[in-house]
Amino acid sequence: MISSQAFVAGMCAIGAGLASIACIGGGIGTGNATAKAVEGVSRQPEASGKILSTMIIGSALSEATAIYGFLIAILLVLKIGNIG
């Protein structure tokens, strides 16, 4: 039979791994936004200022979810050390 402490530690490790998937999503979102911004600037160079400012705002929102996932993963990993 598995102890409750080992079970909680295992679930924290699984949760940390799943939370770190948010970092992958943030990277993909930022990459897609940058690719489309470069494509838009190449088509309309005169609108580069507006395109780039919109891209920066979108990238910030995309990276916010990655940062939240990273912080949750860190908190769960630190919780594993305090279970014992």
From Swiss-Prot:
One of its GO terms (molecular function) is proton-transporting ATP synthase activity, rotational mechanism. Pfam families: ATP-synt_C. The chain crosses the membrane at residues 8-28, 56-76. The keyword Transmembrane helix applies. Keywords: ATP synthesis, Cell membrane, CF(0), Hydrogen ion transport, Ion transport, Lipid-binding, Membrane, Transmembrane, Transmembrane helix, Transport. It comes from the Bacteria. It is found in: Cell membrane. The record marks E63 as: Reversibly protonated during proton transport. One of its GO terms (cellular component) is proton-transporting two-sector ATPase complex, proton-transporting domain. Disulfide bonds: none annotated. It is a multi-pass membrane protein. F(1)F(0) ATP synthase produces ATP from ADP in the presence of a proton or sodium gradient. F-type ATPases consist of two structural domains, F(1) containing the extramembraneous catalytic core and F(0) containing the membrane proton channel, linked together by a central stalk and a peripheral stalk. During catalysis, ATP synthesis in the catalytic domain of F(1) is coupled via a rotary mechanism of the central stalk subunits to proton translocation. Key component of the F(0) channel; it plays a direct role in translocation across the membrane. A homomeric c-ring of between 10-14 subunits forms the central stalk rotor element with the F(1) delta and epsilon subunits. Belongs to the ATPase C chain family. F-type ATPases have 2 components, F(1) - the catalytic core - and F(0) - the membrane proton channel. F(1) has five subunits: alpha(3), beta(3), gamma(1), delta(1), epsilon(1). F(0) has three main subunits: a(1), b(2) and c(10-14). The alpha and beta chains form an alternating ring which encloses part of the gamma chain. F(1) is attached to F(0) by a central stalk formed by the gamma and epsilon chains, while a peripheral stalk is formed by the delta and b chains. This is ATP synthase subunit c. It comes from Clostridium novyi (strain NT). The lineage of its organism: Bacteria, Bacillati, Bacillota, Clostridia, Eubacteriales.
